[in-house]
Amino acid sequence: MTVEATNPVLFIDGPNPFYSQTDEDHFFAWLESIPAVKKVTGRGRGLELIVERPIDKESLRDLIALMTRYDVNRRPLKPLCDEQEDEYFRDGVRYWHSAVYG
């Protein structure tokens, strides 16, 4: 569940459970609306995302928000956060920081 500095492939866990078909539809609609997410493929219980690298900060913020909302493990986002220059992604008091950095 990691991604190398230039690797466009990101593996994440899928949300579990979805509470309705509409819930699932909204998750994938939001995920696919994020500009840096170029492709989404199911892999077992997880998802393989092809992401534009380096990822723009708004797309990364949206990924963090989506994964937080659906309680998806955020650790795979660490390399994406590490390559950001914006101090927002280094601020240890952000609501998502401990979920990404442990």
State what each model feature region is.
Residues 6-13:
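Short, hydrophobic beta-strand segments
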Residues 13-22:
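Short, surface-exposed ligand-recognition loops at beta-strand->loop->(often short) alpha-helix junctions
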Residues 21-25, 60-61:
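Conserved strand-to-helix beginnings and helix N-cap segments that scaffold or border functional pockets
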Residues 23-33:
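Short amphipathic alpha-helical segments
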Residues 31-41:
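Short acidic amphipathic segments
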Residues 39-62:
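Short, intrinsically disordered low-complexity segments
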Residues 54-102:
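Helix-rich interaction surfaces within compact, conserved domain-sized segments
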